[in-house]
Amino acid sequence: MESTNPKQQGNPMNPKDPPKTLTQPPAKKRLATVWLTGCSGCHMSFLDLDEWLFELADLADIVYSPVASDRKTYPKAVDICLVEGGVGTSDNLRLIRQVRQRTRVLIAFGDCAITANVPGMRNNLGGIDAVLATAYGTTAQVFSQLPEDSGPVPKLLDQVLPVHELVPVDLYLPGCPPSASRIRAALEPLLHDL
């Protein structure tokens, strides 16, 4: 008697063989990377994973990344997200809250995400108004006028903050930038165990 279950299939060459259950390959993880206020060095280090990127492609779909997709909105149900950079603009603030809400494991990716690092150096200069006055007034040589309208450029926050000061972080991956081997060591167990 033939099985009517579409997930079971007997051997058509030997009808006496019992039907075998077909197994689905494990679902791929949904991986994202985000670039906030930083230099993109962490993403360049991610690309230094070289041949392991092929294995990564078997384990995960990259659903959002400035270096691997042109998607404009952060998707729902992301398993792992590497967040590069500190939070320094109004857009960064909106995005990091959305990332945390839609991501199972959020990784602070590199020193700027962990401590605000180089972008955070402006925090000691008296606030964003003082920084802009110096940049566009005191030291400007060509255009010594502060722009009145920022247009499509997001509003700068008064300070650049590390990610953990705004949302919970699940894993810290230090380095400026973290090495490719360190990135792999952080991702590999998560991709297999989540």
Placement of each model-derived feature along the sequence:
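Iron-sulfur-associated redox domains of electron-transfer enzymes in respiratory
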Residues: 14-194
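Low-complexity, intrinsically disordered or signal/transmembrane-proximal segments
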Residues: 8-9, 24
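Intrinsically disordered, low-complexity tandem-repeat regions enriched in Proline and Serine
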Residues: 6, 12-15
